[in-house]
């Protein structure tokens, strides 16, 4: 289909995973082929582009249509074996030739609109990121030559529905998907792209003037913060498993207070100095619980029961039965200590807080009174 660099699989946990290509590559290819069709006045069914990473893609063209000096073409998004909300959808380009000598780019149906600062695009503009903007304009210029002009519209009929499965709304991108991709290639299980998308949320909130942020592993944490702590969802950012990365990004951006809120099953790993909490990186949950229970003087019988548990929830039942609920305040304080240690070379250390909760939405523990943490968050 394309060059060897693209066809070579990515190996992840012993499995060969197929690469894909970004919405930016789709839009670039669609715009290029539409421009060529408008110029040549004949349908084209295959198009080649060179991605920003230097990989050549040979892509099949769908729905080619020519009407005068206007042409429409679509490329079907292929995310490879990556988990991708836009996989399989058609990305269209409509190119209308003119004599202006300039290339204009706009977003049509299904392409989101930027409504907030912080993602590097003007408010009110189409959510077509800088790299795809450059590649689209370059591809169209290559196709039409140095003197002609063209109006390029990117659209995606499924965009509104697909966008509901993305983080776009949290980023202030409304009404559709984003046209993104810095390399043009989707690498399966790419943690870097995932981390970057999470960090973008931090950047957007900082650009809006926020200086205090709550970091949670996922939706359960966000719901707890909103419903049990009374904190608005705007103050909450998902960190997934990337605790260390997101804390460092928050510090880099100048946040003055960072509050980690989550279930012990995730956050107790941080108490052990584990800042990537996915199980494939490390799992010292029971060992961490046993160590801190021992420091609190827990009997050997409890330590043994906790050691033999398979889940944190099971261990918590034994901890409650033995009356060692004070463990959670102890763990929360240790989590904060670990975060501060990680940031020890930072000039302006933020306030760090941690709150642990159970699956039934009980507050288990915190490094200081929750009311004081909430009061600071509202400053």
UniProtKB/Swiss-Prot annotation:
Pathway: Cofactor biosynthesis; adenosylcobalamin biosynthesis; cob(II)yrinate a,c-diamide from sirohydrochlorin (anaerobic route): step 6/10. It catalyses: Co-precorrin-5B + S-adenosyl-L-methionine = Co-precorrin-6A + S-adenosyl-L-homocysteine. PANTHER family: COBALT-PRECORRIN-5B C(1)-METHYLTRANSFERASE (PTHR35863:SF1). This is Cobalt-precorrin-5B C(1)-methyltransferase. Belongs to the CbiD family. Keywords: Cobalamin biosynthesis, Methyltransferase, S-adenosyl-L-methionine, Transferase. The gene is cbiD. GO terms for molecular function: cobalt-precorrin-5B C1-methyltransferase activity. Its EC number is 2.1.1.195. GO terms for biological process: anaerobic cobalamin biosynthetic process; methylation. It comes from the Bacteria.
């Amino acid at each position: 289909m394309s060059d060897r660099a693209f066809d070579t699989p990515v190996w992840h946990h012993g499995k060969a995973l197929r690469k894909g290509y970004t919405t930016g590559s789709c839009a670039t290819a669609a715009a290029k082929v539409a421009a060529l069709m408008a110029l040549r006045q004949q349908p084209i069914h295959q198009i080649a582009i060179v991605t920003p990473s230097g990989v050549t893609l040979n892509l099949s063209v769908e729905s080619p249509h020519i009407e005068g000096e206007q042409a429409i073409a679509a490329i079907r998004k292929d995310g490879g074996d990556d988990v991708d909300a836009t996989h399989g959808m058609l990305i269209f380009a409509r190119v209308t030739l003119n004599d202006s000598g300039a290339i204009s780019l706009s977003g049509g149906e299904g392409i989101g609109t930027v409504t907030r600062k912080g993602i590097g695009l003007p408010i009110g503009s189409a959510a077509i990121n800088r790299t795809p903007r450059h590649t689209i304009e370059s591809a169209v210029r290559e196709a039409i030559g140095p003197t002609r002009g063209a109006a390029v519209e990117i659209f995606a009929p499924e965009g509104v529905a697909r966008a509901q499965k993305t983080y776009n709304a949290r980023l202030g991108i409304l009404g559709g998907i984003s046209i993104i991709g810095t390399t043009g290639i989707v690498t399966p299980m790419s943690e870097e792209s995932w981390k970057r998308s999470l960090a973008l949320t931090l950047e957007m909130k900082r650009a809006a003037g926020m200086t205090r942020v709550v970091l949670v592993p996922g939706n359960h944490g966000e719901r707890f913060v909103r419903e049990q702590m009374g904190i608005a969802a705007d103050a909450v950012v998902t960190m997934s498993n990337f605790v260390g990365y997101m804390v460092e990004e928050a510090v880099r951006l100048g946040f003055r207070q960072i509050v980690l809120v989550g279930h012990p099953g995730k956050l107790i790993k941080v108490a052990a100095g584990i800042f990537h909490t996915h199980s494939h990186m490390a799992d010292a949950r029971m060992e961490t619980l046993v160590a801190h229970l021992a420091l609190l003087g827990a009997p050997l019988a409890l330590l043994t029961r906790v050691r033999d548990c398979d889940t944190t929830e099971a261990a918590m039942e034994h901890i409650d039965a033995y009356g060692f609920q004070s463990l959670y305040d102890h763990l929360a304080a240790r989590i904060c200590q670990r975060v501060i240690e990680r940031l020890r070379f930072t000039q302006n250390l933020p306030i760090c807080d941690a709150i642990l909760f159970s699956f039934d939405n009980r507050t288990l523990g915190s490094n200081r009174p929750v009311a004081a943490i909430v009061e600071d968050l509202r400053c």
